[in-house]
């Protein structure tokens, strides 16, 4: 008897992803620090290796380290761009016919291989530049975007009512927040008490358990309910893949097509800003004047991850008194406020207070996915989430690369510039949502519109 709950897989994968990101950044930071100059990095200190006096030679040295780390992150992200785009789009698109488990399994294998490589890299002190090669190879198996896309499609397959989709997706975001919050809070203690080697080994073990659960315990309703088993060549498969993507937009009426494109644009522009700025927080906190150590960085990550919990509570409460689109507006404008506050944060207290407006940052992610799923047919959910994941992979890598490049170029004269730029860029999804609102967005009316189009298609086929 197979289990139809994907939540345990999401739990383990979120733990691994949340722990990997800050650990890898700080590991690379320490390696570059030690290899760039003759300064030793003290891991027992209660403060970070950070000089606040601008006339000190160490201050110029740490600015150089910041630039090198930012550039290396840029190289890593670009190395996984093309294989990640191709694998994400293909794996999620074919999941409509071959089941949601396949992309979950392959992306989990890639994540496990990457974490094992991190263990070896740390234990044998291999050149850290080899991380670029592991990122490139791991991206061929899919990435976390592929995994989340498959999980969301898996959940949508089981939801019959539209309101149920919004709540269920919000529950997943809540679960992500709970895991990432606790993991982020403890990440500094992982480094301090266990070191990088054992921490990476724990990540690999959790990913191995996750893979075992998906392979042997998780059921696949799409594959089990599929009544046809068509064998086709590789070229025919690719043609069918792109044809279904084309038909997703072609079969829609003019108004629904316009709305679909507009919602995709809103989702990706918001994703671009939020994901692009995320890695900059750690570099910003390590640098002067904050000079945070690994424990404070863990606290900051935990506060950032708390937005998953507060976003879930916000969606749960707001869904009784307002539409999805109004919740998305709240999330965008509060995030914009947080970006501006972060840009001017110069003390630890100010930086913690700057995290408060980010409480509803995840709300737009949940409600925009839900809004998108409401304007397509049930048979188009897989290809829709493939498009979303493809655009998120492209947008995410481009965003991280862009923001790392901007931060590297501006850190010397004003580190907070990147956050001010992010606040300005958030006007794009806000304006786009205003246009959606002006088209008289109504969830029930679009449900009826889809039903009418489906009945028209059925009558055309009957004729």
Swiss-Prot record:
Organism: Pongo abelii (Sumatran orangutan)
PANTHER family reported in the protein's UniProt record: LYSOSOMAL PROTON-COUPLED STEROID CONJUGATE AND BILE ACID SYMPORTER SLC46A3, ZGC:174356
This protein's UniProt keywords: Glycoprotein, Lysosome, Membrane, Signal, Symport, Transmembrane, Transmembrane helix, Transport
Glycosylation sites: 38, 46, 53
Motif (Tyrosine-based lysosomal-sorting motif): 446-449
Domain of life per record: Eukaryota
Name assigned to this protein: Lysosomal proton-coupled steroid conjugate and bile acid symporter SLC46A3
Topological type in the membrane: Multi-pass membrane protein
Transmembrane segments: 74-94, 102-124, 134-156, 171-191, 198-218, 262-282, 295-315, 325-345, 348-368, 383-403, 416-436
